[in-house]
């Protein structure tokens, strides 16, 4: 807009006018440049201006300060009133400020001095008078005694750089508040826009009259001058009418309310900024010339303006009287209206065109190049033509010419520089641009040789090119006349364009990264972004996570565009885990149509995906997968076709709502387009991305609260069937008569003879179900039930966890049997036992023989026994009938009876018969013997201690929070904090058995069903008066003896443990504790009454109970307790030769080494940094860094070494195979189709199973993420188990929580264990430590059946939980970005856990205590996260902060009404985007570089408020699952140190996984984080290893026992 002037009425000279000294004025300007808060700024200015204020004003300021201190006035109200008082005191009577510093005859606020004064000033300067800019005069202020009214002026703005300075110009401006009836978050209504057009038309008419009259003299009577009270009153009338029509309430014409920190903009929310804005100082001095050059010829300024003075005193008095009357009416109406109106914070004023905030200090204006001409003139310039006169121009008139444009700027009609990617073009806002046009072949970005142009456009479309792997990404505009490829922006536009370039380059990074890493996580993507060096043209040091989140919408749209170039059956890369997390975090809107976006992606078509690489498989594995897939693909593809149309559309997004294209393959098959209608597929242009996202998320979501599922269905028959005596007859005489039952050996049914031991098919009650199969174990007849048989059931493969993947002819033994009537028998069948061959271990990799030659419908086979509750496949139990019970022997009954007998508590070895009770020396339960003097585990509720501890730590009550400072704190309504141990249960109580007794019945006999034990209580350190801090420094297995006793039910005993007096041990305490499980020691006794520690009494030091055991106490008890340990030391087990596939840095192998069961001779790891780390920690291992498929192919081909000369393990060499194959390659979609089946068939899981089949190791372990058991409706799990069963392995699966095995981290892992025939199948290890119950939901649902592992310690454990404090409190303090690879510890270990991890180093050096260097903004956020437990991003203050790089982080604006969360207690808004009002997201609402990340409140309502992001760890809590890249906004969430302003270090993460401090890592910091995050926690691996060791010991004992028997038999 050109600067204009308007004749102004000359005010009378003020009675009191003064000017500020120059030094004060300078200091006021300096304050504006400083980054002070509004409060600080006002305070400083008051100090400067205090001596210039009248006494009356000073008194009023004192009163205001008193009210503020008494909280009678809010801080905002106080600041508003202070500015109001200053505005009054330092202004003239008519509102014109009276400072004596003039510029061009005008005052700062647009009021004009009298012509006389103007001439005097010019004469004094000795210069000819310059043209006076025509300015709009603001409304006049009220007199000092009245309340001020809203200031408003016409939107004409002066853009002079030298302007009059006023006091109020030194205060920050803010938006005017809307009237109460107006919705604060709504954009200007159509009525107000029309009204503004009317106002503009009025101004044009006045201006044209001015031109006709030439130079207007002093204002004529009756003439309405723009900016005067009469025009303002007219505008107010219109506004009042509009509001009345909306609210149907009386509406005042003025609004006196002012927002405390903002002045009202001239012309309301749609007008330009007032003249007082200091941003004009940032413009070039040539701007007035440029602006003038834009005007139409008839709008040119006159050469000279000579304002005349006329006497208007009468008119002034009338206007003043009318104005005061109007103001009183307004005030009365306002008071009435505010009683019912909701007063809330309103939007700051915006430009009506580009919707930018007019008070934004970064708002810029366009500046045309010199001598700029219009677009049409440029396009006809011969310098841009690439043809000579003899050449034809274009092949078609539809082709647009292409040129290059440099030194360009893009702006709206009001002259504001605008970005092009905020949705303005899509909303038909006309954006123009200027610059220097050059021929298309020019590469020089300088404006030399170009043609300067202005007002190009409007822009119809913008497009991107350069996604071809090159270094550059190009941006172009299309207008109605030409296309322009952009080169360099103008200096003014460069900051805006750099943001655009930044997002283009980030999109390029993301697309190219996903091309090669489609299964990457969000943390992996952040790693890629942060490690990519930005192009030099961007003037950026680094890309950050904030950069990605800022441009997330744009980036996702580019990825969607890339996916559209692929085939319809290809997996979209926008469904990769990292993109799904980005879409959720940033609140990206999917499914925007490109046509509506007016954005074109000009890039080469997506390269054809060649599909997955071929996996090397053995014949057995290949046959299983191929056979099953052939049937399942057809079935699932049929289901997909039936459900695709409904399933793939949400019906809400833009893509779903557009019509079919009629051109794609799916449309051509539709009936409406003349097709057959068979495929029933959605139009390819209507493939809903929201539904695809939902399906991908559903595949990975696992419900922690698994509902109660019915147990696997039993095969009981519910009712009797009528006997048919004619078809059933006994063969031979009864072999045995037992009471009423007569047992037979044979029976004839329908001319078919059956005998005991035969197998039969049984008719089910439900005829729709297949026949049941059973072994006949007894035949008898009795008078009540008739002819009966005892059925020992077989379980069909489909009734196991294998489901449909099982062999249809394979059966499994189960411990399930029942009595049945013979009439239920359908026919005789044959069930063959397939025993493993003697050479089983060497048969791997060869062509598998068919287990059954053909299916005749009556022949089946079985190999294994199946546990239906624990999903365990084991070798059939060896139970043989005796001669006297062959006629009715049932292996199932025998085993079930044996188990019941074991479970029943019993007493043995009576000691003494006392009055009322009988004492015993021994009791048994679950096969475990408990003697007097043994230590026992008891539930926490078994007994209490005689000391009253302080109540457990609870969260402090929530105190009132300043919602203005902490606007997101309201989201913390839940007390639950992820990573907190407040709900962690207590560990077991431990007691030493003093007596075992039973009370006597009334008949004098002992009641052996009610066994009691009397125990001496042991105190743990946390149970003493020293409470929890004592346990932190003490050993985890330290106890204190006490003479306190308790009587407990023997049924409550949870297990046996060893408790020894430390001074009596032959070895050191550390060796004793490490020598076996369940070991405790005590050195002192605790007296609860005196709260003192004493020497233990003599009877405590003895492991027996003197005088009670009649010589069976001390010695025998000790030998009984230590018996397993002695056997372990006697039998030396050879270590298993181990191959670790997908080894990573070696966490699994490290745990097995600590358990002492394996020696890892070979490892395969393709990622070089992890392979190097494995080498560092396992120097004797051969580490292969090749593809596992290549290695297996070499071995199967008979090769001995690989290409690098490394010796390959041969068949028979590998005794243990372990690994965690990555399975993300097929984790994107919940349903299989032919392509995902193909991916799975060639996945690393299949390769790993092929390794198992070829090498046939004694033990096999597969470790993976918890969701492994749920992928593809558990299909991955089923097929893995199916392969193992087909190989002949015993196998099982379960989910373990690493936190229960001694790490301060929640990490649930799926484990598949397998053992070769003849080896005992290990159980899963019982938990060692208590842990948060929420993280211990370990059951698995497969096909609506709930499976659990064999673990029995569900509610407690032997040891307390390990905390963050235990893990890392001894590590020295470091800063953000610390990079010293080796430092000293600076202190001794403080906890038991730290002593374990530090080990016994001679000269301890702390390695890898380094942390990521976060960006300046992230560092500032971390610095402002409080240190209180549970703190996260919701505790960030909404303030401006100076960052370490010198930039300023802004406050977050809340401009929208959040329908869900409402307003704050002070009425402030809580929404940051229009989506909270139920509207589509507004691109212009995005905010960046704010201390509170804009994306989190934007999407928080639908993502649990992003609890935990930017969260601090809690000293007494635990880590979330350690990931590969600790990011404050990543999945792991709480990664900030509890007390230091940084993310956790590599060493802290390694400790959270349980790695010893001596364990070496390799590579840069992100490599090391990835190595740690991908590893199996060694303590978890150790626990599993000890279970394998137990099985090996059991077999060794069995072999030793058999050998002794054999030798004895020979003798």
Swiss-Prot record:
Post-translational modification: Sumoylated; sumoylation increases activity.
Binding site for Zn(2+) 2: 661, 664, 667, 683
Binding residues annotated for Zn(2+), in chain numbering: 351, 354, 412, 416
Locus of motif Nuclear localization signal: 177-204
Keyword Zinc-finger: yes
Principal place of residence: nucleus
Biased composition, class Low complexity, residue ranges: 163-174
Site (Important for activity): 507
Region (Interaction with DNMT3A): 1-148
Region of interest (Interaction with PCNA), residue spans: 163-174
Region: Interaction with DMAP1, residue numbers: 1-120
Domain comment, as recorded: The N-terminal part is required for homodimerization and acts as a regulatory domain. The CXXC-type zinc finger specifically binds to unmethylated CpG dinucleotides, positioning the autoinhibitory linker between the DNA and the active site, thus providing a mechanism to ensure that only hemimethylated CpG dinucleotides undergo methylation.
Assembly with partners or alone: Homodimer. Forms a stable complex with E2F1, BB1 and HDAC1. Forms a complex with DMAP1 and HDAC2, with direct interaction. Interacts with the PRC2/EED-EZH2 complex. Probably part of a corepressor complex containing ZNF304, TRIM28, SETDB1 and DNMT1. Interacts with UHRF1; promoting its recruitment to hemimethylated DNA. Interacts with USP7, promoting its deubiquitination. Interacts with PCNA. Interacts with MBD2 and MBD3. Interacts with DNMT3A and DNMT3B. Interacts with UBC9. Interacts with CSNK1D. Interacts with HDAC1. Interacts with BAZ2A/TIP5. Interacts with SIRT7.
Name the record gives this protein: DNA (cytosine-5)-methyltransferase 1
Protein species of origin: Bos taurus (Bovine)
Lineage, broadest ranks: Eukaryota, Metazoa, Chordata, Craniata, Vertebrata
